Amino acid sequence: MPCGCRSPDFYAMKTRKLAFCGIVACLYAVVTLVTSSFAYGPIQFRIAEVLCLLCLFTPTAIWAATLGCFIANLFSPLPLDLLFGTLATLIGCIGTVKCKNKNIWLLPLPVILSNAVIVGIELAVAFYTRELFWTGFAISAAEVAIGEIAVLYLLGVPLMQVLRRTPAGTYLRTL
């Protein structure tokens, strides 16, 4: 290859990663919007959060889930979600990548904790007075954590266990 030129495989890989990001981001946004009656608010069961665990297979999923979360949060009744909800997803996904060689039951913890803390603060700021901030934060963080635990442990971990054993999981590791 001449100096400065890239192989066709390099461009094919970039295209596959970009397509993967687009598909996962779209899935995240669509699933959140279809389930919006219970995907937003203090007690939320955001089924699309399962896609954050795809970071187990490829770090490319960090950007895919974060973009999907941002798009979904464009429709949130709480404008602060655009910044704080998206930040919580980004931090949770990065934490998942850092934990990927650990026990599969520990994988959801970064996503659960980042959402509970960051979205808990967001909800406390939005819905509680200054005097009740810490009480509001504790309540909001617990509510968000309960929803995240339910979704990630009841749907996410079993799905990741299945993906680990299938050709799809092997393919995802190549991205």
Residue ranges and their predicted role:
Residues 12-56, 60-63:
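Hydrophobic transmembrane alpha-helices
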Residues 3-5:
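Cysteine-centered motifs
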